[in-house]
From Swiss-Prot:
GO biological process terms held by the UniProt record: mismatch repair
Lineage of the species this protein comes from: Bacteria, Pseudomonadati, Pseudomonadota, Gammaproteobacteria, Enterobacterales
Record field: compositional bias (Low complexity): 366-381
GO CC field: mismatch repair complex
Top-level taxon in the UniProt lineage: Bacteria
Gene: mutL
Family: Belongs to the DNA mismatch repair MutL/HexB family.
Gene3D superfamilies noted in UniProt: 3.30.230.10, Histidine kinase-like ATPase, C-terminal domain (3.30.565.10), MutL, C-terminal domain, dimerisation subdomain (3.30.1540.20), MutL, C-terminal domain, regulatory subdomain (3.30.1370.100)
Name the UniProt record assigns to this protein: DNA mismatch repair protein MutL
GO molecular function, one term: mismatched DNA binding
Its biological purpose: This protein is involved in the repair of mismatches in DNA. It is required for dam-dependent methyl-directed DNA mismatch repair. May act as a 'molecular matchmaker', a protein that promotes the formation of a stable complex between two or more DNA-binding proteins in an ATP-dependent manner without itself being part of a final effector complex.
Pfam families with a match to the protein in the record: DNA_mis_repair (PF01119), HATPase_c_3 (PF13589), MutL_C (PF08676)
InterPro entries per the UniProt record, alphabetical: DNA_mismatch_repair_CS, DNA_mismatch_repair_MutL, DNA_mismatch_S5_2-like, HATPase_C_sf, MutL/Mlh/PMS, MutL/Mlh/Pms-like, MutL_C, MutL_C_dimsub
Source organism of the structure: Salmonella schwarzengrund (strain CVM19633)
CDD domains: HATPase_MutL-MLH-PMS-like, MutL_Trans_MutL
Keyword tags: DNA damage, DNA repair
């Protein structure tokens, strides 16, 4: 087949594979667009779990008629215009892919009107070339997006959708996360014509507490310790539940936002868990709602297709900052729970929102509001770091950033407070709580060893050895087999008669390890491998594995997993702080026995006493 340029619709459908995972992904992208447009009210109407209809209606600034066609085109956006903008993202969207991708796998209609226009206009794309048709329509100022029959033209994607209830639960979780990020926006969620959730916009701290309680529940609010921690351009705000009273019901409340964007960052999670570990039992997990504000130049959000992850330029600084902030408030937890006497019952989950800390360039003009006075914390659980902690000037949980850099015309006026950060898997798996930890990573020594501090002792940890144990744990099946990842291009290998016999004997065990294959007369075709092997050179690793199996007389999954773990290539020839912290977090979660009883070659204590004695003088 010759090299050729893909048709626009097919190209968009490929992009949709990363952007549009399920109906909840569509809701996330479209609501984020509404928030970037300065909307103060967003109505979300869902039918049949999003498979039949997703309608997002907002009162934002709208889209001009001449820009409607561009809005449905790939890589067309109003959020960035230069590389400088990309390196300092403060809006939720910036790639300009969502609408084009969604319209390629559904029947999408975009209706919008700006305040300057006398009439609204409607646009939709259809056909192989995704030609956009624009026609007049009736609509107030703002935008409505209707997504009908999601995945109607990609049956393979549609068959992977879950039940109506499951898909709607994912959407409900997305809106819940957005509601925690934006207290200043009213969000109404309906399903099959029935209002299910109503999060009303709020401004006052007391109302925000009620909204927090309505979203996260009264048990969380009763144990919530307020955090206000600052150092330079870093600010940490939010709530963490008192670990001494954390219950199983609270462990699913683990929400973290970076510049208003919902994140699933292992570095942040590790810092929080490490701060709480001394107060948590072996079967407990931390519960928190935290907002991290950082200079946009110091964080890269363009590292994940769905923007669920970020990369910090100074990961060690961020980790230690969060650790100290959470630890400080836990040490000052005497009588720090939030007052509940003014909390109104929330019968139908009718919570509220937060105030944006800046004027939106796209927002519809509004009457000037009275100057706001700096908010003062109502609770005694707050802690401030650095220069005493600056009070927020727009109400909780937003603060004016500690940086004032030129961002270009668009960024000077965009919302300085990020908004939603949806996410992860619908009901994201909670962090595993641990009473045991390797300790705190101080630095990387020799490129492949981490210097750790724990309970006043210093130790060196071999990162390659820890990585090998982690791989073995990931490859060893538990109560269920290891999940197999299908290969885009199956690997076909020629095998000898002895190797073929060995493969047939070990086929069931290999299947438990996530390795699936088919064999014929002289060849074997590898069709799936476990996730830890996806980035390996399978053309070298698999023949070596087959040779190993041919030399064995008996087979066991543990032995095979151990052999694979010892023979895979490390993905990190040079380790960074962030990689080391992430690795240890995974090892502590999957291999807690290594913390209690480290095997040989993993940890080596560092004798500081002899060094200190050598420095002493009579």
């Amino acid at each position: 087949m010759p090299i050729q340029v893909l048709p626009p619709q097919l190209a968009n459908q490929i992009a949709a594979g990363e952007v549009v995972e399920r109906p909840a992904s569509v809701v996330k992208e479209l609501v984020e667009n509404s928030l970037d447009a300065g909307a103060t009210r967003v109505d979300i109407d869902i039918e049949r779990g999003g498979a039949k209809l997703i309608r997002i209606r907002d009162n934002g600034c709208g889209i001009k008629k001449e820009e409607l066609a561009l809005a449905l085109a790939r890589h067309a956006t109003s959020k960035i215009a230069s590389l400088d903008d990309l390196e300092a993202i403060i809006s939720l969207g910036f790639r300009g892919e969502a609408l084009a991708s969604i319209s390629s796998v559904s029947r999408l209609t975009l209706t919008s009107r700006t305040a300057e226009q006398a009439e609204a206009w409607q646009a939709y794309a259809e056909g192989r070339d995704m030609d956009v048709t624009v026609k007049p329509a009736a609509h107030p100022v703002g935008t409505t997006l209707e997504v009908l029959d999601l995945f109607y033209n990609t049956p393979a994607r549609r068959k992977f959708m879950r039940t109506e209830k499951t898909e709607f639960n994912h959407i409900d979780e997305i809106i819940r996360r957005i509601a925690l990020a934006r207290f200043d926006v009213t969000l109404n969620l309906s399903h099959n014509g029935k209002l299910v959730r109503q999060y009303r916009a709020v401004a006052k701290d007391g109302q925000k507490e009620r909204r927090l309680g309505a979203i996260c529940g009264t048990p969380f609010l009763e144990q919530a310790l307020a955090i206000e921690w600052q150092h330079g351009d870093l600010t940490l705000r939010g709530w963490v539940a008192d670990p001494n009273h954390t219950t199983t019901a609270l462990t699913e409340i683990q929400y973290c936002y970076v510049n208003g964007r919902m994140m699933r960052d292992r570095l942040i999670n590790h810092a929080i868990r490490q701060a709480c570990e001394d107060k948590l039992g072996a079967d407990q997990q931390p519960a928190f709602v935290l907002y991290l504000e950082i200079d946009p130049h110091q964080v890269d959000v363009n590292v994940h297709p769905a923007k669920h992850e970020v990369r910090f330029h100074q990961s060690r600084l961020v980790h230690d900052f969060i650790y100290q902030g959470v630890l400080s408030v836990l040490q000052q937890q005497t009588e720090t729970t939030l007052p509940l006497e003014d909390i109104a019952p929330a019968p139908r989950h009718v919570p509220e929102n937060r105030i944006a800390a800046g004027r939106n360039h796209f927002a519809v003009p509004a009457e000037p509001t009275a100057a706001r006075e700096p908010a003062t914390p109502r609770y005694s659980g707050g802690a401030s770091g650095g220069n005493g902690g600056r009070q927020s000037a727009g109400g909780w949980p937003h603060a004016q950033p500690g940086y004032q850099k030129q961002q270009g015309e668009v960024y000077r006026t965009l919302l300085q407070t990020p908004a939603t950060s949806p996410a992860p898997e619908p009901v994201a798996p909670a962090l595993d709580g641990h009473s045991q930890s390797f300790g705190r990573v101080l630095t990387i020594v020799g490129g492949d060893c981490a210097l750790l501090e724990h309970a006043g002792t210093i130790q060196l940890l071999s990162l390659p050895v820890a990585e090998r144990w982690l791989r073995q744990a990931q490859l060893t099946p538990g109560q269920s087999p290891v999940c197999a990842q299908p290969l885009l291009i199956p690997l076909r290998l020629k095998v000898s008669a002895d190797e073929k016999v060995a493969l047939q004997k070990a086929q069931s065990l290999l299947g438990e390890l996530g390795i699936e294959f088919q064999s014929d007369a002289q060849h074997v075709t590898i069709r799936a491998v476990p996730l830890p092997l996806r980035q390996q050179n399978l053309q070298i690793l698999i023949p070596e594995l087959i040779g190993y199996l041919a030399q064995q007389t008996t087979f066991a999954t543990v032995n095979i997993a151990q052999w694979i773990a010892r023979n895979v290539q490390s993905e990190h020839p040079q380790w960074s702080m962030a990689q080391a912290i992430s690795l240890l977090a995974d090892v502590e979660r999957l291999c807690p026995q290594l913390v209690k009883a480290p095997p040989g070659g993993l940890l080596q204590p560092v004798d500081l006493h002899s060094a200190m004695n050598a420095l002493k003088h009579e």
